[in-house]
Swiss-Prot record:
Gene name of the encoded protein: Pdpr
Keyword entries, A-Z: Mitochondrion, Transit peptide
Major location category of this protein: mitochondrion
Disulfide bonds: none
Transit peptide: 1-93
Database matches in SUPFAM superfamilies: Aminomethyltransferase beta-barrel domain, FAD-linked reductases, C-terminal domain, FAD/NAD(P)-binding domain, Folate-binding domain
Family assignment from sequence similarity: Belongs to the GcvT family.
Protein name: Pyruvate dehydrogenase phosphatase regulatory subunit, mitochondrial
GO cellular component terms, semicolon-separated: mitochondrial matrix; mitochondrion
Subcellular location: Mitochondrion matrix
Pfam families in the record: DAO, FAO_M, GCV_T, GCV_T_C
Amino acid sequence: MLYRLLSIVQRQRTSPGWQTWSSARSSTSTAEAHSIALPAQAQVVICGGGIMGTSVAYHLSKMGWQDIVLLEQGRLAAGSTRFCAGILSTARHSSVEQKMANYSNKLYHQLEQETGIQTGYLRTGSISLAQTQDRLISLKRINSRLNVVGIPSEIISPKKVAELHPLLNVHDLVGAMYVPEDAVVSSADVALALASAASQNGVQIYDRTSVLHVLIKKGQVTGVETDKGQIECQYFVNCAGQWAYELGLSNEEPLSIPLHACEHFYLLTRPWDTPLQSNTPTIVDADGRIYIRNWQGGILSGGFEKNPKPIFTEGKNQLEIQNLREDWDHFEPLLSSLLRRMPALETLEILKLVNCPETFTPDMKCIMGESPVVQGYFVLAGMNSAGLSLGGGAGKFLAEWMVYGYPSENVWELDLQRFGALQSSRTFLRHRVMEVMPLIYDLKVPRWDFQTGRQLRTSPLYDRLDAQGARWMEKHGFERPKYFVPPNKDLLALEQSKTFYKPDWFDIVESEVKCCKEAVCVIDMSSFTKFEITSTGDEALESLQYLFCNDLDVPVGHIVHTGMLNEYGGYENDCSIARLTKRSFFMISPTDQQVHCWAWLNKYLPKDSNLLLEDVTWKYTALNLIGPRAVDVLSELSYAPMTPDHFPTLFCKEMSVGYANGIRVMSMTHTGEPGFMLYIPIEYALHVYNEVMSVGQKYGIRNAGYYALRSLRIEKFFAFWGQDLNTLTTPLECGGESRVKLEKGIDFIGRDALLQQKQTGVYKRLAMFILDDHDTDLDLWPWWGEPIYRNGKYAGKTTSSAYSYTLERHVCLGYVHNFSEDSGEEQVVTTDFINRGEYEIDIAGHRFQAKAKLYPVTSFFTHKRRKDDVELSDFHGK
């Protein structure tokens, strides 16, 4: 039957219908597209007339900004937006993407009434199919998250699937998820409706106008150069879709926007003899790698193949996007999957195979936010084939970012500043997107890692650790050890093991954690971001006092844990700062803060020749010596007393370790366990590591990885930025009051907001949850994002979790809210409110009882054994 379908296709290739589908209507029919001279100046210039650009223009104008110009190189909605399959799905793995898609759905639903332009919006619902139990678990996790944010959904049986869509073959299904309010829509018409509404609000729209480059002066946008002249402006928004990468590089100060295009295929058929009902649900068969929707009485079906075809690697195609060449051989696996799922298609005539470009990013999430190097330069691009679903919400969040300084939701996982220039080479992007595109429909189990673009940034110890069994994860392009596999383990089986249940590395991490608590372990943490701030006078101290909420005017050698807050009191960074001398400071931040923190510091530090900010991440290898025997190892290597009397907690000192001088030794471990961080000049890294491992043998030393670190820090209730802390989280909401000095004698960013919050109270509170009735061996594991229930009512979600080998329980961190039963509005959360509740954690639809704590469970840690009693033979050779 496949060959019969292909023969029909061959006959239809000469049909006029092949050339007429989805021709975007003239932009002048719905929005005032000007052919007159461009204005000399504007407040905002937006590049791109697809759904992203028109959404940003629409929302900026709704928020009161009027002096806006939108430029499109071709016709409005005639780029990738024109070829969009028109499926609006709210079933996303990411919480912020769920909210963006839900907002988009509501926005598109009312656009016809607002503008009078038909958008083809039809609420059909969607059904996501599961051929395996693991896929069903994944859908159940999504379902539980959708329900708590007000998106109706349910898990249904194969029989119910057949009732909702009678043409589907359901014999191989184990279940499905039904989302009744998902929709289909004409993406081009949505973009034109948004443009029309924006135009009515004063936005000036010019088509057939190309942006050549952005004008920049002293790190600030000053205007744009187009093929029709210059426009002075304060803000520029790059919504150029697949050309956003090229446009970013064309600036006077090049900007890296890491995205790359791939070919994306879907077919269109002639109508059925007896058409399906117009509201027949859209089908997503991720295990079969296909999607199916009604289209003009027939069907539209495409998918995400395992072997995608990247395009335009060499640079920008100057022509307006057209349908790319058909490739039926490439599409054949998807077509076969389609015929298995819908056998009745054998008799249906195929009209056309559409091949259009779609853009993808290195981590499968869209890119939005302000440039780290140019103020006033914003980006919204790289939608990973979800532009229609996310476009309305993404445009709203970016407009809020521009107007108010911050979006209303935490969008760090989408922020342009999560990437560095190192992730923007053409070769890297070409290889990475070939992995990303199939991942859209691949089963996403916890803790999976990308396989392409690896070993981009490594510690000097990488080869040494790799030879000792290190298994690697990647963060901001940096390789970090997850755990170390003993020689007798099957490495291949361990790496290929993917599960929502107890992982195969459980026992390995347990032995690493035990060693951290009873002997000594070494974790390579070289990926940490490291800055030095120095001055000739007091400028460094004065500037840092303004930028950070804790008091940094401490004696030389002391370390301060502190937040770098925004004006709303939220965490832009959570870091440790050591005072090296009276006028120099050493700042340690999370790995993925390298670009963001650098941009923030450069934005607020005075432009003073006496003040120097230097990124020294690459200069130092960082080793974390954790455990009660760390003091013995370091004492023997340095011939210096390292006991608390001589080297108190949160103290920093440059010392000799082995033969190496200038090692910055800090009495902290980021876990609450005893030990030291060693910041080693990279030329000494191998020597110091070898000496530590050699001397440490008699103390039971071994390597450990970040999985052990996570277990240790979560059981001690240590919140990490990017997971538990973000720009919308304040110190008062996460138990960080002790790291805020409101009366330190100098104003700091966020102080007014914290003073106000201290008076009014907090509306959420970070708590620690210990699962009671959870069977580690048999039950699904928590990871992050699980709904939290208080007294049977939704109260928040988890932010991170780990198994505590000390408590022999799973521990989750998460925020508790107090939602009014009458209005649903948030109310003040008090300590009493937390303590009086009975809690459950929802894991894929099953609720597990949990105890909530606002402080670490210290009673479990009071039985510390004396180091002399440790049976060191337990650790030798492991």
